[in-house]
Amino acid sequence: MKHPFQILITNKKGTHIFAIVKNYLQVFDISKGGGDDDIKVGEWQDTTESNHPKIQIEKRTGRQISTQQIHNHLRYLILTPDEQHIIASTDSDKSILIFKIDFNNSINCLKLIKRQPIPKRPSSITIDSQGQRAIVADKFGDVYTVSINDDSSMSEIEIEIEKDIQPILGHVSMLTDITMATTHHNNNNNNNNNNNNKQFIITADRDEHIRISNYPKSYVIKNFLFGHDEFVSQLYIPVQYDPSILISGGGDDFINIWKWYEGELIETIQLRQYIESYLSDDHLPPTRFRTETSPKEISIAKIATLRTNDEEEEEDHLLIVLVENTPVLLVFNLDDSYKAKYLQAIIVNDSIIDFAIAADNKTIITSLESEQHSIKYFTLQEENDGKKFSEIQGPNIEQFIPIEVEQKSDFQQLYTIFQLRKRSDS
């Protein structure tokens, strides 16, 4: 059977899906009107061997060292604002990969133009508003920047690697997510225009902190957002709709909505009442930390929004939340003041690994931990009780997955966010 996709993202129009499965990056044109056979328009495989010390010692000595296996998997995937480049990271050599996207190339739309090593393994990636630099957080709490250079005349990876790159900011705790924010939509009613188009880095860590730092002068901290009790794993700004808003979630039973520049918490959405029945014993604490009254724990895997723009219909602003290792997407309707109303649960038979939104046709694409039919599509439709997401037929992109496994236990570890939760023996 096929190994499922671990990461899905789409371009703004939702015409293309970019997907990661283990050490492969694939691109699909789901707008094609023809058959499924011609929808794959790009593919790249990472064949670089790990430079982990364990691997190098084994190669030199011939002795096998019994430690946790180091895989050459791809992680994290983000498009630049102009969608001309896509950025990924590797486990094998702790590098940032920068690809040029050229849909005019009928053979392969992906061209690797830079492979930049990072001192420690990346934990999250974002892009500055000009699309000139990738901002990279690592598992040791540091943040680096990597230039996104492009020279269309180059036929190979010839861009000079940046040597001895230095962190631009740091946390004392492991960084769990990072995003960029700008103020150009925040101060329309402010007579002082000095803040217009200013950039900020927003970082989250395992210690419940959300920090807002100036960029590029990131040693200047604007403020902190305090409102979480557990780790923060997701920072989401609806850039296309309202970049003044930040939505955050992690190990708490709730997600928060902020006016990030003002440091104002404007809404808290409680999730347990909607997700409790979909939690399993896998969500209990490890045995050594478990008591008779231990609740099943919530870990937020992904947050996204979708705003409909139908001229003939009332506009909807929808918030979609994925709790890790559950077979459900929670959908909320947000009003103009960002007060949330529960809309529906999109339920499938297997745990959802990731999802992406094709905004123009109001479709959600999900990747499932399934032995068959690991991709499902849902679109927003008018029903008797209002608009709801319903399953539809979509392009069969899973047929192109190049990784075969014997059984589900051979899948790569698909759920890791729960490991961010801090434990105590006391």
Swiss-Prot record:
Pathway it belongs to?
A: tRNA modification; N(7)-methylguanine-tRNA biosynthesis
The stretches annotated as WD repeats are 69-111, 170-225, 227-270
Q: Which GO terms describe its cellular component?
A: cytosol; nucleus; tRNA methyltransferase complex
Q: Where in the cell is it found?
A: Nucleus
Source organism, top-level taxon: Eukaryota
Alphabetically ordered keywords of this record: Nucleus, Repeat, tRNA processing, WD repeat
Instruction: Tell me the Gene3D superfamilies matching this sequence.
Output: YVTN repeat-like/Quinoprotein amine dehydrogenase
Q: Which GO biological process entries does UniProt record here?
A: tRNA (guanine-N7)-methylation; tRNA modification
Q: Which PROSITE patterns match?
A: WD_REPEATS_REGION
Q: What is its main location?
A: nucleus
Function according to Swiss-Prot or TrEMBL: Required for the formation of N(7)-methylguanine at position 46 (m7G46) in tRNA. In the complex, it is required to stabilize and induce conformational changes of the catalytic subunit.
Under the subunit heading, UniProt states: Forms a heterodimer with the catalytic subunit TRM8.
**Which family, according to UniProt?**
Belongs to the WD repeat TRM82 family.
User: Per its record, how is this protein called by name?
Assistant: tRNA (guanine-N(7)-)-methyltransferase non-catalytic subunit TRM82
Q: Which organism is it from?
A: Candida albicans (strain SC5314 / ATCC MYA-2876)
The UniProt gene name for this protein comes to TRM82
